[in-house]
Amino acid sequence: MSETKVYPVPETIQRDAHLNFEQYQEMYNRSIQDPEGFWSEQADKFLDWFSKWGTTCHWDLAKGDIRFFEGGTLNVAYNCVDRHLETRGDQTAIIWEGDEPDQDEHITYRDLYERVGRLANALKARGVKKGDRVCIYLPMVPEAAVAMLACARIGAVHSIVFGGFSPEALRDRIQDADAEVVITSDEGVRGGRSIPLKANTDKALEGCPNVKTVFVVRRTGGDIAWNDGRDVWFHEACAEASPDCPPEHMDAEDPLFILYTSGSTGKPKGVQHSTAGYLLGTAMTHKYIFDYQDGEVYWCTADVGWVTGHSYIVYGPLANGAKTLMFEGVPTYPDAGRFWQVVDKHEVSIFYTAPTAIRALMGQGDDHVKKTSRKSLRILGTVGEPINPEAWEWYYHTIGEDRCPIVDTWWQTETGSILIAPLPGAMDLKPGSATLPFFGVEPQLVDDKGNVLEGATNGNLVINRAWPSMMRTIYGDHERFFNTYLAAYPGKYFTGDGARRDEDGYYWITGRVDDVINVSGHRMGTAEVESALVLHDKVSEAAVVGYPHDVKGQGIYAYVTLMAGEEPSDELKQELVKLCIQEIGPIAKPDIIQFAPGLPKTRSGKIMRRILRKVASNELDSLGDTSTLADPTVVDTLIEDRANQ
């Protein structure tokens, strides 16, 4: 194996960083040895409480029981907005950068307080109360953050659906959460194109008779259909409401939000997060992992429709009184220099994006980068998937000009906040490694039988204890929560990822070990794509796997078996691609479709996905034993016809 490069902590960063390595070690050891004392101190330091909790932490992962700060009361919107008014009411809270370079807006903490209060009162006026679910289907506009915080203010549980999802996917999520209110927009704008969010919502609601109210944000002024009894203009409803809305006193363990994520089987799961533990996790990681210093501009390029946007555009930064940037556009519009132009325009200090964006921009060459100064940058970050060392090096040398540490952060929708990442002032960096665990996180590598592996080794990544921002359940299905995450290795949380630990104890994430593919940093369950493909009346069976993709990390490779008598064609391929987009969204579009007369199955009828993955990845010399297949000749045909030669 080639020698791993090590990049030491720059002296300029070390000088002012919140923590050095000794301080990290001391805090980490305490968080593992004395969780009660440690979490109690942090909860007091980072959050404001209405009343104190009884028990700091209680968990029994073998039973699926997780509780932190139970009995304590607080409010997330109060912590993200109200408590900053006295000291920084006139400071910018959110910088909004629109799709077009000449559109932007600065929203102060005082503005934010009023906007959140008005919407909170407008929701209450329409019958929304503590515990009710509100679905948010918005583009990257400030109203998305306002809607999240307004829900949190009154104790309603928000469920955000990414604006790129189809009407069918939106409908399923509204139905599963049993939401009675939807907040959407006339249209979204992205990369110079408009997205028909209101039309998608109308279509989705044909199957959701329970939805009583739809708030519509006016983003483009485009023509939309209107349902008089149900639809209300967001700006009109807010204008009629008072800006002052008393924050609901929430128990630490009350749900804050549900966010749907792809699983390896069946329909998406509604990951449910708590109030206090989640907010504490996002605030602490935002401060320490990004080494956030007061007054800096922090930019996470994610969409609020994903957990990264929840935790690191809205909740973490605002809990810390930060200036957070929200970007409506895409990295390549109007040209491939847009990210760096925005960095210069708003003097961004901390920049957090996905490896897939870095690889795409790297492919466009350095000219767009060189036209900008980027001198304000101090810390760079990556999220969503492991970053390959080549992309890491380009990010470090070309974007950061050798002066900005890169925090390669590993976490999941389910974990709520970052679990494994370097601290910029404390740890030497190895390109491609997620480095070391955050406070209170105890990673282990286990073999398939659950034996804990010591030292430098490869294995399945599990976490051996609960942490505050950990998901509490799958909405409406605690049994599925337990079976998915806690049953495989009793007493441990199973991440679904494989990892390697090196001789320095650094962790390297090697990718999913289940049937989930990571496309451009977003999870896509193979079962979801397969279900969409078999809806076509000419398709008898489909199997979907991931394969290495230069830009996206993983691409979607679909093997499709047709009904007897049906012929493969390019037209049929196009129809199948359209079907996936219609059922799920553009993110689920197969990159490669291979028509296969048969799939490799065991004698009991189970599809051998391992073989399909190897064929899709052209790893033909490591297919393993095919003798257990019902018909081993199927594999020869797959290899001969493979579309990825």
Swiss-Prot record:
CC terms in the record's Gene Ontology section: cytosol
Known EC number: 6.2.1.1
Annotated Mg(2+) binding sites: V534, H536, V539
GO terms, molecular function: acetate-CoA ligase activity; AMP binding; ATP binding; metal ion binding
Modified residues (N6-acetyllysine): K606
Entry keyword set: Acetylation, ATP-binding, Ligase, Magnesium, Metal-binding, Nucleotide-binding
InterPro entries assigned to the protein according to its UniProt record, in alphabetical order: Ac_CoA_lig, ACAS_N, AMP-bd_C, AMP-bd_C_sf, AMP-binding_CS, AMP-dep_synth/lig_dom, ANL_N_sf
One Pfam family this sequence matches: AMP-binding
EC primary class: ligase
Superkingdom of source: Bacteria
Processing after translation: Acetylated. Deacetylation by the SIR2-homolog deacetylase activates the enzyme.
Known function: Catalyzes the conversion of acetate into acetyl-CoA (AcCoA), an essential intermediate at the junction of anabolic and catabolic pathways. AcsA undergoes a two-step reaction. In the first half reaction, AcsA combines acetate with ATP to form acetyl-adenylate (AcAMP) intermediate. In the second half reaction, it can then transfer the acetyl group from AcAMP to the sulfhydryl group of CoA, forming the product AcCoA.
NCBIfam families: Ac_CoA_lig_AcsA, PRK00174.1
Family: Belongs to the ATP-dependent AMP-binding enzyme family.
Identification of the protein by name: Acetyl-coenzyme A synthetase
Native species: Halorhodospira halophila (strain DSM 244 / SL1) (Ectothiorhodospira halophila (strain DSM 244 / SL1))
